[in-house]
From Swiss-Prot:
GO terms for biological process: CMP-keto-3-deoxy-D-manno-octulosonic acid biosynthetic process; lipopolysaccharide biosynthetic process. Pathway: Nucleotide-sugar biosynthesis; CMP-3-deoxy-D-manno-octulosonate biosynthesis; CMP-3-deoxy-D-manno-octulosonate from 3-deoxy-D-manno-octulosonate and CTP: step 1/1; Bacterial outer membrane biogenesis; lipopolysaccharide biosynthesis. The keyword Metal-binding does not apply. One of its GO terms (cellular component) is cytosol. It comes from Chlamydia trachomatis serovar L2 (strain ATCC VR-902B / DSM 19102 / 434/Bu). This is 3-deoxy-manno-octulosonate cytidylyltransferase. Its EC number is 2.7.7.38. One of its GO terms (molecular function) is 3-deoxy-manno-octulosonate cytidylyltransferase activity.
Length: 254
C-alpha cells in the first residue's frame, strides 16, 4: 500500500458486476484472460502512471483481481457511476495524487500510449480541467449509431460538445468526424469538484455525464489519437469481435 501513499499519477479502473447489457462483464473471458485483467494489464504498460488499481463494490471482482496479482480497492455501493467510484478511491487512498486517469474496463484493446498522451496533454495545458481522447472515423455505422459518442472541438483542442448524434452535420462541406473514447484524465482537485456538479439538462438529454462540465463553463480538452483502440465490450457478442481483433494483431506482429 506504500505506492498508494506516494503516487502522483494514478490510473483507476472502475469495475461493476451489474451491467444491464452484460451482467458479469468484467469476468468474461477473452482468449483465456478476463476482461478486467486485460484492461488492467494494458494500463500497467503505460509509461506515465505510478500506480494502477481496480475499484469495485463486488467481492467476486475484488477476489479475481487479487488472484491474478492486481491491486484492487472495495468501494461503497452508493456510487452512482464510475467517476464517483474513482473519486472515492482517490480521496481515501491517494493523498499525494495530482493526476487521476479514469480508465474504462470495457476497452481491452486500448493502447497504453493513449493514457500517456492524456497525462502529457494535461501536464502541458494549464487551461485544461480534464482531457479525453478522440479518434477520426469514416465508418458510417459508428457515425450514425447512438452507442458511439461523437465530439467537436476548436482549433486549440478544447471540446465544444459531445453527442450521440452525428456531429458536425456535413450539410455543405465535408468535415472530419471524431469518435470519443471514454477515458478521462483529471486534475485531482477538479475531480473532487466534478462529482459534485449536479446533472444538467444536456447531460440528461444525451445521457453523457461529461456535458455537465461544459454547461458549467469548465474545460475539457481532447487528445487526438490514431489506431489506438479496437472494439470495446458492450454486449456478450462483442467478445468474439475482440478476440478476432487480438488474433489479427498477434499475427501482424510476426
Amino acid at each position: 500500500m506504500f505506492a498508494f501513499l506516494t503516487s502522483k499519477k494514478v490510473g483507476i479502473l472502475p469495475s461493476r458486476w451489474g451491467s444491464s447489457r452484460f451482467p458479469g462483464k468484467p469476468l468474461a473471458k477473452i482468449l483465456g484472460k478476463t476482461l478486467v485483467q486485460r484492461s488492467y494489464e494494458n494500463a500497467l504498460s503505460s509509461q506515465s502512471l505510478d500506480c494502477v488499481v481496480v475499484a469495485t463494490d463486488d467481492q467476486r471482482i475484488f477476489d479475481h483481481v487479487v488472484e491474478f496479482g492486481g491491486l484492487c480497492v472495495m468501494t461503497s455501493t452508493s456510487c452512482a457511476n464510475g467517476t464517483e467510484r474513482v473519486e472515492e478511491v482517490v480521496s481515501r487512498h491517494f493523498p499525494q495524487a495530482e493526476i487521476v486517469v479514469n480508465i474504462q474496463g470495457d476497452e481491452p484493446c486500448l493502447s497504453p500510449t493513449v493514457i500517456d498522451g492524456l497525462v502529457s496533454t494535461l501536464e502541458n495545458n494549464p487551461a485544461a480541467d480534464m482531457v479525453t481522447p478522440v479518434t477520426e472515423t469514416t465508418d458510417p455505422e459508428a457515425i450514425l449509431t447512438d452507442h458511439k459518442v461523437k465530439c467537436v472541438f476548436d482549433k486549440n483542442g478544447k471540446a465544444l460538445y459531445f453527442s450521440r448524434s452525428a456531429i458536425p452535420h456535413n450539410f455543405k462541406h465535408p468535415t472530419p468526424i471524431y469518435l470519443h473514447i471514454g477515458v478521462y484524465a483529471f486534475r485531482k482537485a477538479f475531480l473532487s469538484e466534478y462529482v459534485k456538479i449536479p446533472p444538467s439538462s444536456l447531460s440528461l438529454a444525451e445521457d453523457l455525464e461529461q456535458l455537465r462540465v461544459l454547461e458549467t463553463g469548465r474545460s475539457i480538452y481532447v487528445h487526438v489519437v490514431q489506431n489506438a483502440t479496437g472494439p470495446s465490450v458492450d454486449y456478450p457478442e462483442d467478445i468474439t469481435k475482440v478476440e478476432q481483433y487480438l488474433l489479427c494483431l498477434s499475427k501482424a506482429s510476426f
